[in-house]
């Protein structure tokens, strides 16, 4: 194999590695965003549950629609 051919193979390997790394990173970011949305939903459910109890809503007026 000549030097030019070896260099071409090297470039192809680097390109393939970059493409695989980039696509797997984007998929990972999507999973993180989904987990973050799920956490936000759980937090909002917990806050709504707190607001339905008078003692909790008095202690957390900012979350339950009251003035701070």
UniProtKB/Swiss-Prot annotation:
The modification Cysteine amide is found at residue 64. Disulfide bonds join 50-56, 51-64. Pfam families: Toxin_8. Residues 22-48, 65-68 form a propeptide. It is found in: Secreted. Its main location: secreted. Alpha-conotoxins act on postsynaptic membranes, they bind to the nicotinic acetylcholine receptors (nAChR) and thus inhibit them. This is Alpha-conotoxin-like Lp1.2. It comes from Conus leopardus.
